[in-house]
Amino acid sequence: MRCPKCTSIEDKVIDSRISKEGSTIRRRRECLECGYRFSTTESLVRDGIVVIKRDGRREEFSRDKLLHAVRAACHKRPVDVEQITMLIEDVIDMLEAHYDSEIPSAAIGDAVMQRLRSMDQVAYVRFASVYKEFRDVSEFMQEISALGKKEK
């Protein structure tokens, strides 16, 4: 792993921890050149999963794209990186259990929304606004109203 400070590739692993769900490993590393300490996260690379978009196009599944979307929804919310990582892994595990090699994008969006709803309602509405392509404020109001009804 390349040191983010001096770019040396010589380092040693100081500590390794497996995540609660068991699908990622966090490693604490120390650069042997400059002594800088940094963390890395390792996860299983899932090959061959194709997402079927709404318009029928197909593209390779990108964990990073999903992570970026969830991070954007959770920006400046009381949701930590570990919660986001667990959400992503949970969604991916669920999708792999229900689908073989092709996953409809709607299934991904629905799975994320279901988990965000119970995690953080503001993040849920943010994600829903992009996923459902809200065009005006009335659509936000409808989603917020529906969210309030589901809570009761």
UniProtKB/Swiss-Prot annotation:
This is Transcriptional repressor NrdR. Binds 1 zinc ion. Pfam families: ATP-cone, Zn_ribbon_NrdR. Belongs to the NrdR family. Keywords: ATP-binding, DNA-binding, Metal-binding, Nucleotide-binding, Repressor, Transcription, Transcription regulation, Zinc, Zinc-finger. One of its GO terms (molecular function) is zinc ion binding. Negatively regulates transcription of bacterial ribonucleotide reductase nrd genes and operons by binding to NrdR-boxes. A zinc finger (unnamed) spans 3-34. HAMAP family: NrdR. Its cofactor is Zn(2+). One of its GO terms (biological process) is negative regulation of DNA-templated transcription. Residues 49-139 form the ATP-cone domain. InterPro entries: ATP-cone_dom (IPR005144), NrdR-like_N (IPR055173), RNR_NrdR-like (IPR003796).
